[in-house]
């Protein structure tokens, strides 16, 4: 899936990605980044996974 980083709080280690197709926001945790640094507005690819409180982004990669 693809989306745009709505915001990412580096000090708290989480943020949200807006899904490009649905417009829905999906939670992203620092543990899903594998060392990738996210900035607000970055375009990303990710895998939608089921978390404890609903859908979360996993395997997040920044794209051009």
Question: What residues fall within each predicted segment?
Answer:
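OB-fold/S1-family single-stranded nucleic acid-binding modules
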Residues: 49-64
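Beta-strand/loop nucleic-acid-binding surfaces
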Residues: 24-36
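Short nucleic-acid-contacting surface segments enriched for D/E, G, S/T with interspersed K/R
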Residues: 33-45
